[in-house]
Amino acid sequence: MSATLSAYRNALRATKVVFRHDLPILTAARTQIKENIRNNSNLKDTTEIEEAVKKLNDVSKFLISNIVQGEKQDDGKYFLNFHEKTELGDNESIKQGKKNLGSLAGKKGSSIRSCKD
């Protein structure tokens, strides 16, 4: 199977996983992917083709790992539809970042007050 066809199928699978509960968005995403494939079908240069395939693979990876659909519930809260491929961070990068923020990083003090009207 060609790399282009494989990337195309992976993109369609990614949209199916991410947008499974939202038919209008699923349809729009798939239409956009198909449109981009058609627009790039006239590429002849192998480097341009490889770049287009890489871009499509990157889009698929981004969709699968970073996009989560949310549904508003009757109580006004949102229910997020995580799936098994959603990238969940462990907050280690946030903890590491606090060390470099300066003297107020992660500290509570009485000198910091909120303004009340």
Swiss-Prot record:
Record keywords: Ion transport included?
A: no
Primary site of residence: mitochondrion
Q: Where is the transit peptide?
A: 1-10
The record's annotation in InterPro entries points to: Complex1_LYR_LYRM7, MZM1/LYRM7
The cellular location(s) given in this protein's UniProt record come to: Mitochondrion matrix
Start and end residues of each stretch annotated as Disordered: 91-117
Q: Which GO terms describe its molecular function?
A: protein folding chaperone
The function of this protein is: Assembly factor required for Rieske Fe-S protein RIP1 incorporation into the cytochrome b-c1 (CIII) complex. Functions as a chaperone, binding to this subunit within the mitochondrial matrix and stabilizing it prior to its translocation and insertion into the late CIII dimeric intermediate within the mitochondrial inner membrane. Modulates the mitochondrial matrix zinc pool.
What family is reported? Belongs to the complex I LYR family. MZM1 subfamily.
Name of the protein = Mitochondrial zinc maintenance protein 1, mitochondrial
Question: Where does this protein come from, organism-wise?
Answer: Candida tropicalis (strain ATCC MYA-3404 / T1)
Q: Which gene encodes it?
A: MZM1
